């Protein structure tokens, strides 16, 4: 379970990345973080993986309060969160559809549900026509 309560992240340069974010993700739920360039997607993920600390607000993952989590416990936290990144973290021997479906197959989600979720997500980000493409056939932003 992931909970973000009134999370704000402002970089030292003064650039605000996130402002007052509230997010609740239940155990077993799949969430896709999509948005325009510069909208804070990467910052949000880095906060959840504790690569960054919030300027204000609270973050919990599996009832662990990230704001106080020690470096020693970080690997255990990160094992509990499945993240698919857009940059070079896709499986090169699988097409885009299979890359997106992979995590859901691991937790044995029903095939019918996997198909509908993957197609809906691809449609949402404008890549439905590229579902058979491999990672090396897409641009960095795709």
What are these regions (language model features)?
Residues 49:
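Helix-to-loop junction immediately C-terminal to a conserved catalytic motif
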Residues 64-65, 101, 105, 112-130:
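Conserved ABC ATPase "signature" region
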Residues 70, 97, 131-134:
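Signature (C-motif/LSGGQ) region and adjacent switch/coupling loops
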Residues 134-142:
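Conserved ABC ATPase signature
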């Amino acid at each position: 379970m992931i909970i973000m309560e009134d999370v704000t992240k402002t970089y030292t340069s003064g650039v605000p990345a996130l402002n007052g974010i509230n997010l609740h993700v239940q155990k077993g739920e799949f969430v896709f973080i999509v948005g325009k360039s510069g909208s804070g997607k990467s910052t949000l993920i880095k906060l959840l993986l504790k690569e960054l600390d919030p300027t204000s607000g609270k973050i919990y993952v599996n009832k662990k309060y990230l704001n106080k989590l020690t470096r020693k416990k970080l690997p255990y936290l990160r094992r509990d969160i499945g993240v698919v990144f857009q940059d070079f973290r896709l499986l090169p021997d699988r097409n885009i559809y299979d890359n997106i479906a992979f995590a859901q197959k691991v937790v044995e989600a029903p095939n019918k549900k996997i198909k509908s979720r993957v197609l809906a997500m691809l449609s949402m980000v404008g890549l439905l026509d590229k579902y058979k493409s491999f990672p090396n056939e897409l641009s960095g932003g795709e």
